[in-house]
Amino acid sequence: MIALIQRVSRASVVVDNQTLGSIDKGLLVLLGVEREDNREKMEKLATKVMSYRVFSDENGKMNLNLEQVGGSLLVVSQFTLAADTGRGLRPSFSGAGTPDQALTLYEEFVAFCRDKGVTTETGQFGADMQVSLVNDGPVTFNLQV
């Protein structure tokens, strides 16, 4: 399971000209599911995302996590993160999770974060989305479990 996280001052996702999710300070999470992923991996990754210290403390050091800064999550499904780009000029998605598996784990990821008290907004699974963000830093990390 893969989470590409970006520290943002604001982010939103639009589908069919309607804003589905919007946050101010927090993390934009592009979430990719691979074939071997399961609930255990999802919980480990969600915990890591929520606990990852990517926000600056009073000394300017990345030392604070999402909860410590009162931040939110915007979680957007992104199967292209599971692409194999090692050969040729066209990505292979053979390692990506099935649509049913990915939808289940995406929904469980969102529910897990909400159950932990984190304000969590979403896009629409499988939709053509327009994602807007102001990347604070920029700060971007690729987390995998």
From Swiss-Prot:
It is found in: Cytoplasm. Belongs to the DTD family. A motif (Gly-cisPro motif, important for rejection of L-amino acids) lies at residues 137-138. It comes from Shewanella sp. (strain W3-18-1). InterPro entries: Daa-tRNA_deacyls_DTD, DTD-like_sf. A Gly-cisPro motif from one monomer fits into the active site of the other monomer to allow specific chiral rejection of L-amino acids. The gene is dtd. One of its GO terms (biological process) is D-amino acid catabolic process. The keyword Cytoplasm applies. The lineage of its organism: Bacteria, Pseudomonadati, Pseudomonadota, Gammaproteobacteria, Alteromonadales. This is D-aminoacyl-tRNA deacylase.
